[in-house]
């Protein structure tokens, strides 16, 4: 799938707001993000800094692990560049506003690596297919 500026503009703030709202209910404080080109969000809870990458899924509907239609969750390999400073990688369902997430240290493991040819990009890209039971659902 190629990058769509229209889809980004439509869903980026929506996804980040859903995650922010969820974090606030869990006692996090949203803090300014110092890196415009890094992960999407930073939060603090009890003096510990957390980092959050947020993507929105508009073509897959789920409310929980049980009704998620696949056995694995596919995470983009190009986000691996941020793994030196661990982060939570989140997907937000546009229809249900449910969040699924996994920690970067869990995602970026050789056993989950898959390479696929992406027609719209004309290249092979790396993905990580993490078993859905290893993800967090909220």
Q: Which positions does each model-derived feature cover?
A:
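Intrinsically disordered, low-complexity, compositionally biased regions/tails
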Residues: 19, 42, 81, 124-126
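Non-catalytic C-terminal interaction segments of nucleic acid-processing enzymes
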Residues: 25, 44-46, 94-138
């Amino acid at each position: 799938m190629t990058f769509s500026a229209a889809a980004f503009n439509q869903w980026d703030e929506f996804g980040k707001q859903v995650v922010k709202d969820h974090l606030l209910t869990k006692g996090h404080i949203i803090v300014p993000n110092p890196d415009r080109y890094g992960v999407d969000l930073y939060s603090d809870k009890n003096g510990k800094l957390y980092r959050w990458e947020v993507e929105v899924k508009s073509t897959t509907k789920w409310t929980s692990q049980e009704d998620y239609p696949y056995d694995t969750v596919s995470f983009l390999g190009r986000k691996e560049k941020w793994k030196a400073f661990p982060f939570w990688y989140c997907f937000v369902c546009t229809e249900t506003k449910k969040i699924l997430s996994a920690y970067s240290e869990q995602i970026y493991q050789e056993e989950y690596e898959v390479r696929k040819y992406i027609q719209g990009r004309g290249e092979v890209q790396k993905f990580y297919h993490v078993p859905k039971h290893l993800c967090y659902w909220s």
